[in-house]
Design a protein with these regions (language model features):
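Glycine-rich hexapeptide-repeat left-handed beta-helix
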Residues: 1-132
Length: 136
């Protein structure tokens, strides 16, 4: 954990692998592991306020200036850029998209591509065997 110009309220939990800069964390708040308080915008430093008994999910990025109200939650992996009012849940993360065959097309000849090729071949063999047993 790294703290810079931060005030941590009594009973608040701020675990390892967390950076808290230019922030106030309310009493009883819980900051998930890997959370980053992104306080510098390239020009100046901005403040983040986390309310009492708020819960910040692991690996959240709080982009200052931002405020989480008392009892507010954020979902793990979110990038929070706007206020999360008291008692609300802030979710800000993109939907996962898997680009089929990306490694084979873009990383040909690498160990990753070779491993993926073997795994996909094994999956296809299993699928063929499974389909064959259904028709018998």
């Amino acid at each position: 954990m790294e703290l810079k110009k931060a005030v941590i309220g009594p009973g608040a939990k701020v675990p390892h692998l967390t950076y808290v800069g230019d922030a106030t964390v309310g009493a009883g708040a819980n900051i998930g592991a890997g959370t980053i308080f992104a306080n510098y915008d390239g020009v100046g430093k901005n403040h983040t306020t986390v309310g009492q008994h708020a819960f910040v999910g692991s690996s959240t990025v709080l982009v200052a200036p931002v405020e989480l109200g008392d009892g507010a939650y954020t979902a793990a992996g979110s990038v929070i850029t706007n206020e999360v009012p008291a008692g609300d849940l802030g979710i800000a993360r993109g939907r996962q998209h898997n680009s089929d065959g990306w490694v084979a097309r873009n990383r040909r000849g690498t160990r990753s591509a070779d491993a993926a090729q073997r795994d996909r071949s094994d999956d296809r063999r299993l699928e063929i065997l499974t389909l064959g047993s259904r028709t018998a």
